[in-house]
Amino acid sequence: MQAPRELAVGIDLGTTYSCVGVFQQGRVEILANDQGNRTTPSYVAFTDTERLVGDAAKSQAALNPLNTVFDAKRLIGRKFADATVQADMKHWPFQVVSEGCKPKVRVSYRGEDKSFYPEEISSMVLSKMKETAEAYLGQPVKHAVITVPAYFNDSQRQATKDAGAIAGLNVLRIINEPTAAAIAHGLDRRGAGERNVLIFDLGGGTFDVSVLSIDAGVFEVKATAGDTHLGGEDFDNRLVNHFVEEFRRKHRKDLSWNKRALRRLRTACERAKRTLSSSTQATLEIDSLFEGVDFYTSITRARFEELCSDLFRSTLEPVEKALRDAKLDKAQIHDVVLVGGSTRIPRVQKLLQDFFNGKELNKSINPDEAVAYGAAVQAAVLMGDKCEKVRDLLLLDVAPLSLGLETAGGVMTTLIQRNATIPTKQTQTFTTYSDNQPGVFIQVYEGERAMTKDNNLLGRFELSGIPPAPRGVPQIEVTFDIDANGILSVTATDRSTGKANKITITNDKGRLSKEEVERMVREAEQYKAEDEAQRDRVAAKNSLETHVFHVKGSLQEESLRDKIPKEDRHKVQDKCQEVLAWLEHNQLADKEEYEHQKRELEQICRPIFSRLYGGPGVPGGSSCGAQARQGDRSTGPIIEEVD
């Protein structure tokens, strides 16, 4: 039999929700998870017995706030000292600690303190998306295209790629979220001629604006702008702060230090925010929120808009910047396309529509699924799919930030300008600053400011062994090379000796080493094995419980009650009670212990019921359904196993 063709999936790894899609038979399928939902919460929870990912993790967040981790995307590729990380830590119930300047999340798992890098948490979400795809496709999934905000910097892109590797995925490409959404928008509009499209992507935690021209399957990004720290979570934070103050005013109690109360309030605020997109008022009803006090209140859409007015208005600045960089007037934009759940907020839509002089906004694509849709198409293209729809599709993306190095006096010398089409390669010649200088120290930065101290340091390396010469004589050739993922490598070569040194930006800025990634891959396998062992344990426990109740139920059957001797009936009943009592006190026993208890019960029941049925049978449980069927059908009920 022919092996199934390998398929690659597209994964939208979101701040609050993630989504996976696959392109096959000429169309994209967005895949539902085991709960039937097409988006999965980007949540991971750790308990005394197991690890939960997705819906199961989010649904128990209020009961287990310290060990339920979310917002990993707001940590990934950042340093612990980053101002945004410090600000976010005030809102997170879980603990974030610093290890070698990198943030790690500290939780309690199976009674032990564990700490995880953001890449590891994200890899657990990616593994969940991988499992969702495998369940649908019925075959292993090894390849994926993963999306990131267009304004993610080099560190954040590489960290996302590492997360994919830890999840056991070959990451074919890291692509920008608004570009993926543009593919979703433009794929079925091929005959429309050249169109300028502005993608306005406001999600749970990040905000991007990209301007593209789309023509006959060529998607060319003209400019991109955004804020990697603006989204629905920030609107939730404003609501939470508002209601904490209201609670303090009304009840003279401060709930801000109680993690569980805050989690319950945040969940209610998120629900209220969604309600306000379709209604002008939302009510919150939270029983016994804090110290026995019930919290019943309401909020109007106008009040919500006023609380977030500065955040909503700030979304227009990147729109103006992207248009300026693309050298386009707003009148030249054919389609303004809304992507991301937060674009459902009426005030955001109104501000954007007014900015474009009343132009109708394009809401034709599903804002929650568009990014995964586009990623799935790009995955098919990279796997060489011959479908006519995607065969000629070409994606030309850009570098979101200028890249350069530090020269004398701390000046930023730019080699690659922002919005340069990628992949790209630029070379420039530099020289020494002093006589007989034995080496040069090359520091690589990204950003738009004139001085390097105001930009983001990506990495540094040294080119040594330069022959002694007066200042200005040696010629050092520096090459910046950005690949299609937007990841940078830098090479420096001394032209007189041919000596070279190269970095694909190193650990200086918080990137995981190859060894660390390999260790995390091994640990991810171990966690997966532990999860499977936990599932088997629960299945064995359920099987034992079901078996006991089957047996007890059979003893109550009128047709059997008089046929079983009283002594035997008491013997079976006593054993059932003994097993139930054991179960009550051994909720966390091993799979083997549950199976042993079940075998003991079967050994007592088998001779009693075999006399009754005229064959070796026990009503109920795994060993009895078939045997009961072999007996005389008129003597008793057929008992099936219930999983």
Swiss-Prot record:
Residue ranges, annotated region (Disordered): 617-643
Region (Nucleotide-binding domain (NBD)) residue ranges read 3-388
Q: Where is this region: Substrate-binding domain (SBD)?
A: 396-511
Q: Which residues carry this modification: N6,N6,N6-trimethyllysine?
A: 563
Residues bound to ATP: 14-17, 73, 204-206, 270-277, 341-344
Alphabetical list of Gene3D superfamilies matching this protein: 1.20.1270.10, 3.30.30.30, 3.30.420.40, Actin, Chain A, domain 4, Substrate Binding Domain Of DNAk, Chain A, domain 1
Which keywords accompany this UniProt record?
Answer: ATP-binding, Methylation, Nucleotide-binding, Stress response
- Know anything about its domains from the record? The N-terminal nucleotide binding domain (NBD) (also known as the ATPase domain) is responsible for binding and hydrolyzing ATP. The C-terminal substrate-binding domain (SBD) (also known as peptide-binding domain) binds to the client/substrate proteins. The two domains are allosterically coupled so that, when ATP is bound to the NBD, the SBD binds relatively weakly to clients. When ADP is bound in the NBD, a conformational change enhances the affinity of the SBD for client proteins.
Q: What family, per the record?
A: Belongs to the heat shock protein 70 family.
Summarizing the function annotation, the protein's role is: Molecular chaperone implicated in a wide variety of cellular processes, including protection of the proteome from stress, folding and transport of newly synthesized polypeptides, activation of proteolysis of misfolded proteins and the formation and dissociation of protein complexes. Plays a pivotal role in the protein quality control system, ensuring the correct folding of proteins, the re-folding of misfolded proteins and controlling the targeting of proteins for subsequent degradation. This is achieved through cycles of ATP binding, ATP hydrolysis and ADP release, mediated by co-chaperones.
* Official protein name in the record: Heat shock 70 kDa protein 6
- Which organism is this protein's natural source? Saguinus oedipus
Which taxonomic lineage does the organism of this UniProt entry have? Eukaryota, Metazoa, Chordata, Craniata, Vertebrata
Q: Which gene encodes it?
A: HSPA6
